[in-house]
Amino acid sequence: MMEDKITIEKLNLYYSDFHALHDINMHIQKNEITAFIGPSGCGKSTLLRSLNRMNDLVEGCRIDGSIKLDGTDIYNGDLDVTVLRQRVGMVFQRPNPFPMSVYDNVAYGPRIHGITDKKELDEIVETSLKQAAIWDDLKDRLKKSALGLSGGQQQRLCIARALAVKPEVLLMDEPTSALDPISTSKIEELALELKKNYTIVIVTHNMQQAVRISDKTGFFLLGDLVEFGETDQLFSMPKDERTEKYITGRFG
């Protein structure tokens, strides 16, 4: 039986007077890749950023309903948001390495969480870079600036940085949109490997990417979750006419 990692119930999100998400209900299961697709402005990134409360940083943002991580409402007032963001990591659209060495990029999060022992940090950096499938590329460049890496290397470094604090969920907001096809393929292969140990939620404009790597897909339109289900079924036999029109390119 599949285990729910994140449960979203009757979620409505507002930016001041703008109603951005309407009554979203969704079960995101452990050790799966869930893809959010839909045209620009449909709400998919807004929902993604709600899963670790990044939207808290947006003035006027408020929610009704609930998002539960392992059964605990993440919008509970007693919840430490820093701990939440350790458990639910994020990789952004454009690679955003810090202006410091490769090593210090990966060690940044563990240091914030109180790890100072060099041997322990060395192990975390090596393990995280190996998990991100970039250790062999960077093991001799650990003390060099991360800003000198290629775009694809920078994005895998950012994934390693997210993994260094041992998250349970990894959110990816269009992680390959700024990358070339070869780098994109490497990130997709990496995501498929990472789902063995992590739950992954990815926003993508690339529908074929959703087909290639995701187990479940949600199609969003104008703040509504139009359809959600097994990726193969959603793309081969969509239940909603709007989904069918979108995936066949008739709008979007």
Swiss-Prot record:
Alphabetic keyword roster: ATP-binding, Cell membrane, Membrane, Nucleotide-binding, Phosphate transport, Translocase, Transport
Native source organism of the sequence: Lactobacillus delbrueckii subsp. bulgaricus (strain ATCC 11842 / DSM 20081 / BCRC 10696 / JCM 1002 / NBRC 13953 / NCIMB 11778 / NCTC 12712 / WDCM 00102 / Lb 14)
EC number(s) stated in the UniProt entry for this protein: 7.3.2.1
Homology family: Belongs to the ABC transporter superfamily. Phosphate importer (TC 3.A.1.7) family.
One Pfam short name: ABC_tran
Protein name as annotated: Phosphate import ATP-binding protein PstB
Known role: Part of the ABC transporter complex PstSACB involved in phosphate import. Responsible for energy coupling to the transport system.
NCBIfam families per the UniProt record, alphabetical: 3a0107s01c2
Complexes and interactors: The complex is composed of two ATP-binding proteins (PstB), two transmembrane proteins (PstC and PstA) and a solute-binding protein (PstS).
Domain ABC transporter: 6-247
GO molecular function: ATP binding; ATP hydrolysis activity; ATPase-coupled phosphate ion transmembrane transporter activity
Localization in the cell: Cell membrane
UniProt xrefs under PROSITE patterns: ABC_TRANSPORTER_1, ABC_TRANSPORTER_2, PSTB
GO biological process: phosphate ion transmembrane transport
Residues involved in ATP binding: 38-45
Topology in the lipid bilayer: Peripheral membrane protein
SUPFAM superfamilies in the record: P-loop containing nucleoside triphosphate hydrolases
Catalysed reactions listed for this entry: phosphate(out) + ATP + H2O = ADP + 2 phosphate(in) + H(+)
GO CC terms of this entry: plasma membrane
Family annotation (InterPro entries): AAA+_ATPase (IPR003593), ABC_transporter-like_ATP-bd (IPR003439), ABC_transporter-like_CS (IPR017871), P-loop_NTPase (IPR027417), PstB-like (IPR005670)
